[in-house]
């Protein structure tokens, strides 16, 4: 009797790793507890749906709802084992996933989820919380602007101001960069008033006083600083050069340049981080109708790296301004417009110098050219008896552009200076430590880069309703938390053992690294094409899994995940 061999295949790749990490954080239970599930909904609960969708996003680098259903139906055995529930063909339908986004869009629900998730994260994993970094970013999309929508015209950090924007405010733990809280706002909102609500949420999530909150100059509003000081926390941020503060900052820097104020070299071990000085000043502000008094340390510091960067920018502006000045008075010729008035030339030169911010640094010299032209009066052919008329044509021409070395030297002395403020006592945060802490604030900027880049791809979002835009943005920040955990835990494990890992770079199998990225770690599983094969022949059936390599086992070990996440998928894998 002839028996038919039937083979079925499921690509496993990094799915067990992602869902295993989510299960370790009890993410499905946290989401279920706060989002809830309709009493008539059958099959997977909303928390399980969200975890499955997160696995799809991180594994396939795609956040579209429409593609999740086919992906899940191609892996029923894998997802059933990892999610602990049978997978029906309708589980990951567009309607069900849309319901998850709607529940995630509710502010109270989202706040409760972030509180519980942070508690679960610090319970499972050890985090060094040296401070909290706050910042904002924007995301564009091809959406129609509506009065009540979250997509609005506003400033774009992706250089797409022609498209509607949404704004993401986030707070991350330093130095790990793990997200603590995230708020979604309409794209036209200014940053300044958005810091205080986020600070209040973070304070409730972390539940610890005395933390150091760092941010950029948009966080330096007096009301924001007062809010932090009133709750016995600390802040660190640069002051903006706007309004009255700009005048104060210039005077503090002038005192150094003119030799009135001495500075101290800032050493970090054998590395010099710059120079600077600090002084204290008392501040007062109203918080919730009550006065708040505190002492602020003003730190005027110079960064050699920043000075070099500003010097290079200044030289580019010089060159551009000089080229534009010379182009104002081209040689006479067809199509060459000539300036025939001294006031017009002077006004044009002033506009060029001010536009490139080099006023006083360049001096242009010019001269007046007069040309006498004699012609016949009236129309017609000339002759000896025709009357003539003599005209004097005037044009102005630049003869040179000279750099004012004394003014340039004075400008160079002012390059690289920045003023930052903190209310932390000096015994907790010295001047050098404050400089090092602020300059080391790359963690949240990199988190934003990961959020916008593959596999998450925040821009653009392929949903249209305001609730779904907000919900999907928040779902992607959950995916970012998982991706960050993958990265930080593997790096921590390698650092503890003083090891490096090879095999993560395509085309360079022997290249090693001590700081692998989360994306490359996931790609190491995807490139292996780990496949679960279902073999059926007559009444006999079995599951077989592509063997894990030593690299995969090592990465799982650093993540504190068992290899049984993979091997248990097949009862007779080899």
Question: Language-model features: where?
Answer:
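Anion-binding and metal-coordination hotspots
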Residues: 1-19, 32-574
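Conserved active-site/ligand-binding neighborhood in enzyme cores
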Residues: 22
């Amino acid at each position: 009797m002839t028996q038919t061999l039937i083979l079925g295949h499921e690509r496993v790749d990094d799915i067990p790793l992602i869902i295993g990490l989510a299960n370790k954080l009890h993410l499905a239970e946290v989401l279920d507890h706060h989002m809830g599930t309709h009493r008539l909904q059958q099959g997977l609960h909303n928390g399980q749906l969200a975890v499955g969708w997160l696995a799809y996003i991180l594994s396939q680098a795609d956040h579209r709802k429409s593609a999740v259903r086919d992906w899940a139906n191609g892996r029923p055995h894998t997802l059933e084992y990892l999610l602990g529930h049978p997978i029906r063909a309708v589980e990951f339908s567009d309607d069900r996933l849309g319901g998850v986004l709607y529940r995630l869009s509710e502010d109270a629900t989202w706040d409760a989820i972030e509180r519980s998730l942070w508690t679960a994260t610090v319970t499972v994993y050890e985090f060094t919380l040296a401070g909290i970094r706050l910042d904002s970013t924007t995301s564009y999309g091809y959406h129609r602007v509506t009065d009540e929508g979250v997509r609005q015209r506003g400033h774009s950090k992706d250089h797409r101001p022609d498209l509607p924007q949404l704004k993401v405010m986030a707070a991350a733990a330093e130095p790990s960069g793990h997200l603590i809280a995230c708020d979604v706002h309409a794209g036209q909102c200014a940053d300044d008033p958005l810091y205080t609500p986020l600070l209040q949420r973070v304070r409730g999530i972390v539940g610890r006083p005395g933390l150091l909150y760092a941010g950029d100059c948009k966080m330096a509003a007096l009301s924001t600083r007062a809010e932090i000081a009133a709750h016995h926390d600390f802040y660190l941020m640069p002051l903006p050069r706007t309004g009255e503060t700009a005048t104060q900052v210039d005077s503090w820097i002038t005192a150094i340049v003119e030799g009135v104020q001495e500075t101290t070299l800032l050493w970090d071990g054998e590395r010099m981080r710059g120079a600077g000085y600090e002084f204290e000043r008392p501040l007062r502000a109203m918080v919730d109708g009550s006065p708040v008094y505190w002492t602020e340390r003003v730190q005027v510091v110079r960064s050699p790296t920043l000075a070099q960067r500003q010097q290079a920018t200044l030289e580019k502006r010089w060159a551009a301004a000089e080229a534009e000045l010379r182009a104002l008075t081209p040689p006479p010729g067809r199509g060459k417009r000539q300036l025939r008035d001294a006031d017009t030339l002077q006004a044009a030169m002033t506009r060029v110098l001010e536009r490139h911010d080099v006023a006083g640094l360049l001096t242009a010299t010019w001269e007046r050219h007069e040309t006498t032209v004699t012609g016949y009066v009236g129309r017609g052919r000339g002759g000896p008896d025709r009357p003539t008329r003599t005209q004097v044509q005037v044009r102005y021409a630049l003869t040179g552009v000279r750099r004012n070395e004394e003014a340039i030297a004075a400008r160079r002395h002012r390059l690289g200076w920045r003023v930052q403020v903190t209310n932390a006592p000096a015994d907790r945060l010295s001047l050098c430590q404050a400089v090092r802490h602020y300059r080391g604030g790359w963690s949240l900027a990199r988190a934003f880069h990961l959020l916008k880049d593959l596999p998450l791809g925040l821009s653009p979002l392929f949903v249209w309703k305001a609730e779904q835009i907000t919900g999907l943005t928040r779902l992607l920040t959950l995916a970012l938390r998982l991706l960050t955990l993958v990265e930080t835990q593997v790096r921590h494990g390698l650092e503890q053992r003083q090891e490096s890992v090879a095999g993560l770079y395509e085309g360079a199998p022997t290249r090693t690294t001590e700081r692998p990225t989360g994306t490359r770690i996931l790609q190491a599983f995807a490139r292996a094409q780990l496949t679960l094969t279902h073999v059926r022949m007559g009444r006999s059936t079995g599951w077989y899994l592509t063997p894990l390599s030593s690299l995969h086992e090592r990465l799982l070990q650093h993540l504190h995940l068992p290899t049984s996440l993979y091997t248990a998928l097949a009862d007779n894998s080899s």
